[in-house]
Amino acid sequence: MPHFTVVPVDGPRRGDYDNLEGLSWVDYGERAEREDSDGQGNHRENSPFLCPLDASRGNDYYDRNLALFEEELDIRPKVSSLLGKLVSYTNLTQGAKEHEEAESGEGGRRRAAKAPSMGTLMGVYLPCLQNIFGVILFLRLTWMVGTAGVLQALLIVLICCCCTLLTAISMSAIATNGVVPAGGSYFMISRSLGPEFGGAVGLCFYLGTTFAAAMYILGAIEILLTYIAPPAAIFYPSGTHDMSSATLNNMRVYGTIFLTLMTLVVFVGVKYVNKFASLFLACVIISILSIYAGGIKSIFDPPVFPVCMLGNRTLSRDQFDICAKTVVVDNETVATRLWTFFCHSPNLTADSCDPYFLLNNVTEIPGIPGAAAGVLQENLWSAYLEKGEVVEKHGLPSTDTLGLKESLSLYVVADIATSFTVLVGIFFPSVTGIMAGSNRSGDLRDAQKSIPVGTILAIVTTSLVYFSSVILFGACIEGVVLRDKYGDGVSRNLVVGTLAWPSPWVIVVGSFFSTCGAGLQSLTGAPRLLQAIAKDNIIPFLRVFGHGKANGEPTWALLLTALIAELGILIASLDMVAPILSMFFLMCYLFVNLACAVQTLLRTPNWRPRFKYYHWTLSFLGMSLCLALMFVSSWYYALVAMLIAGMIYKYIEYQGAEKEWGDGIRGLSLSAARYALLRLEEGPPHTKNWRPQLLVLLKLDEDLHVKYPRLLTFASQLKAGKGLTIVGSVIQGSFLESYGEAQAAEQTIKNMMDIEKVKGFCQVVVASKVREGLAHLIQSCGLGGMRHNSVVLGWPYGWRQSEDPRAWKTFIDTVRCTTAAHLALLVPKNIAFYPSNHERYLDGHIDVWWIVHDGGMLMLLPFLLRQHKVWKKCRMRIFTVAQMDDNSIQMKKDLAIFLYHLRLEAEVEVVEMHNSDISAYTYERTLMMEQRSQMLRQMRLTKTERDREAQLVKDRHSALRLESLYSDEEEESVAGADKIQMTWTRDKYMAEPWDPSHAPDNFRELVHIKPDQSNVRRMHTAVKLNEVIVTRSHDARLVLLNMPGPPKNSEGDENYMEFLEVLTEGLERVLLVRGGGREVITIYS
């Protein structure tokens, strides 16, 4: 047998290689041409991340440090060349991108996208404030406090604010579960709940936003005609303040005019709306500050707004000036206008007077007593009224009697019947608007950070304003004034304006402009929402509304929005439109909470929100609260809203495809399973729904016992009881003779699955060859859409010592089968050292060595493992390799950004691997590998001799490797910078005694073998990577590593096994991962 000696040599200068016999320097700069398909199933798949990088591929292929992966670099590119693309994403939704490309017909020419730059304050917090504060605060909150009382008003505010806060928490979880492109709330809901629910809820949200525009316009008209310019009314009501047909017609005419003007403004350009947005917000803030200033001033100097009372009834002050029955003029008692109204005569005769007017005195009380007057105690309790009932003050003396019907218009009366539920429906729109920030997601610098912080902060701020306003109004304003919706008792002043400082006009003007601004914002946002739904193409008849002007403005959608808003204008009553608005928003919020609860309970791998302060119980509580509020405020409106959503759902489902509901004969379970399987079979899952569905291939011993049960343990830890797990095995033989054996093996595996707590199915096949049986399992396991997408395959231990080449041939053929089937492959090496389900790692790392990108499996697997109690405490580290021409600092930044978008917590490290010369150790090890392979083919050795020879080579490999990698400091100090080099000594070989009868004639030619250049490069990759990995990850709990693909030429299979051995040498637990050729993890929500 030939001998090898290990001798120290000088450092690796290029000239030293020339002294080695049979070694010539190879120039690796030139690359060979590549084919689109390798004939072994390694087909390309179109993907934004798995794409041929023709521009830079030339240098990549023959990079010495990555030569082991060179055959597949066109479909599995280098990480360094990919990170820039991964972190630079577009703000357009997928549907919008497809729509734009279809319209332009050329995807090549694109306008340079402007980078999003808005932060939390300007992008989320202030827009949410502007949308939440609205017309209800200024026009209805005082009336609500007077009607419901301070305590019940606080309860209404608490319920509504809790509803929006819980929804905001759920929305924050969804918004931080990936990058939220433009499309905001609709995008989040539709991508979380699917097209049917997403389309239904998206349209509900759109209708809610459209009716909000109508509500704001009606509020602006009410302010204009009631408080700013009452003479501008075209129609005059028969009574003083009743909502007669004349008043409603005024609202309709002016509302239509306002709507037309606002639509024209939005059509001309949304930039004008955005320019005035800050002005409108300033109006809101100034108005609120003036209310607080007036409340403080009322403590020591309350404003003078007297209220005229007849008995305990409140009189409407807009038709008379003097609050008295008679006055003395020139020592003569004369009747006032008030007497004239009640007695229908200027004379002081009581013949035709109203009986109640004669029996009760006229008094005047302060409308704003101030915070120090103690009216809060009187205003604590509710005073609900029926329609037409007079507003009365409790505690004032009054003689009850029937009055004249025509005198009713002189009192302040309730225009609608009130109750707790009615007030809830009217008030709820004043807490909507929480999605204004998420609707601007495309403009946010960091949506995952800004949306939760800005939205929740805005809700807390507005809630505090509402709570304090309720208490302030109850403490400062007289109860009868609070219940006076239109301010008739205080000379037709806006009630909240009477408290404001320095003037009521601050509130009147401020509220008018803020409601106009909110209406413009709604008319701007609603068409864009409809355009996003139309571009998704889930509702065919809406497709036309996806088109717009050349600059993308949704012209047709704006027209439809204006028409629907006109329906709200025709209703003409703010109190009637508000509950409709509440229904649609509550429906939307209900499904946001449902989406969060469902995602949390299903525990899909893609559900990794950065926002951690959520729980499915909070989402369920928010969903229940939304449903309860819908039926509490208006049960018939709730039914109509749910009917509309249901019809949209069924329409989208019908348009998508015909659905199979099952025959129902064999029971509900079978019907549901069949229906679900038929649904699943429609196509592959979306990237965000991808989870590993495992096919675990087990090896059985002669007694049909599982040889490596830790494979099942690993599968149970990876799955954590979720998803599909199929355990398969092959029995070699004839099916007719081995059927009973297969049944016994299946039962043995099922028992082991129960022990290891693997929830799944078992399948044992009988085949004449193990390779064929494994191929059959890979092809045929599963049913319909419930099929495996990942294969767990054990490592063939002892393949070097085996006399039968099938030991490693079966393994490599199975690798090729999984690649051809586009399945992911997981190969746990040293499986005996993997932890059991009863062990706990209290610390340590799971190290990911991301060499090439093949779909993101390497990032997803540690996340799934860490969901299990065994690996829960382990921290994740990601290493990637940088070459000489890579910017390692930028790579580290890009990788950190990419992981941030993936919502994965991991330490990031970029390892620089210089293009060092190929070491003599690498060269000699390659030579030994090829010589050993040649010798085993050529020599007719007995089994004993073959085992001894193979073990001898292995022992020399291990000893040399340990000496090279793990030499202690003492030896290093002696050797200095010397390297270890293996040298083939021909003299020793010639002097070696050996029996020529056991050797072929051409054995002597083995010493003249030159190692294949590609094998030298591959061995160099394996050695260098192994050195780096062992140095940094020798103490890791688990190392995940890209698995190189098998060679295209099957003659190099044995060398491929050797490369994998060298790559993983010295590591305790290794998981070799090979992606299936598709993306399995995404930064998007």
Swiss-Prot record:
Bilayer topology annotation: Multi-pass membrane protein
Primary location group: membrane
Residue sites binding chloride 2 per the record: Y589
Claim: Transport is one of the keywords in the record: yes
Record flagged with keyword Transport: yes
Reactions listed under catalytic activity: K(+)(in) + chloride(in) = K(+)(out) + chloride(out)
InterPro entries xref list: AA-permease/SLC12A_dom, KCC1, KCL_cotranspt, SLC12_C, SLC12A_fam
Binding locations of chloride 1: G433, I434, M435, Y589
PANTHER family linked: SOLUTE CARRIER FAMILY 12 MEMBER 4, SOLUTE CARRIER FAMILY 12, CATION COTRANSPORTERS
Name of the molecule in the record: Solute carrier family 12 member 4
Record organism: Mus musculus (Mouse)
GN (gene name): Slc12a4
